[in-house]
Amino acid sequence: MNLEAYFPVLLFIIIGVGLGLALMTIGRILGPNNPDPDKLSPYECGFEAFEDARMKFDVRYYLIAILFILFDLETAFLFPWGVALRDIGWPGFFAMGVFLLEFLVGFVYIWKKGALDWE
């Protein structure tokens, strides 16, 4: 097995990691270090922090985030399918139809369960 072809990749990784570490070290050494209470306090839209950071968080935000990720992934699958539709033909068309139908059924289900109601 000829490993000489991988030498440029190894060199690229070594230079990238070395340059990154060198720049972080130079920034740490030469950068100003003047900690004070204002700089060390958490920033909350220009106001003082109201409550502890470990307060309870409404689960609906998580639900909306998960739904966003699911439909974002659906969109990510739709683009390459649209580009390759001419090559994959009717079997690919029907496979994507089943995929979209599953998402539609899931969307109707969460809609009927009230997951999208913000009351």
Curated annotation (Swiss-Prot):
Belongs to the complex I subunit 3 family. NDH-1 is composed of 14 different subunits. Subunits NuoA, H, J, K, L, M, N constitute the membrane sector of the complex. This is NADH-quinone oxidoreductase subunit A. The keyword Translocase applies. The chain crosses the membrane at residues 7-27, 63-83, 88-108. PANTHER family: NADH-UBIQUINONE OXIDOREDUCTASE CHAIN 3. NDH-1 shuttles electrons from NADH, via FMN and iron-sulfur (Fe-S) centers, to quinones in the respiratory chain. The immediate electron acceptor for the enzyme in this species is believed to be ubiquinone. Couples the redox reaction to proton translocation (for every two electrons transferred, four hydrogen ions are translocated across the cytoplasmic membrane), and thus conserves the redox energy in a proton gradient. It is an enzyme of class 7 (translocase). InterPro entries: NAD(P)H_OxRDtase_bac/plastid (IPR023043), NADH_UbQ/plastoQ_OxRdtase_su3 (IPR000440), NDAH_ubi_oxred_su3_sf (IPR038430). One of its GO terms (molecular function) is NADH:ubiquinone reductase (non-electrogenic) activity. Keywords: Cell inner membrane, Cell membrane, Membrane, NAD, Quinone, Translocase, Transmembrane, Transmembrane helix, Transport, Ubiquinone. It comes from the Bacteria. Its EC number is 7.1.1.-. It is a multi-pass membrane protein. Its main location: membrane. Pfam families: Oxidored_q4. HAMAP family: NDH1_NuoA. It is found in: Cell inner membrane. GO terms for cellular component: NADH dehydrogenase complex; plasma membrane. It catalyses: a quinone + NADH + 5 H(+)(in) = a quinol + NAD(+) + 4 H(+)(out).
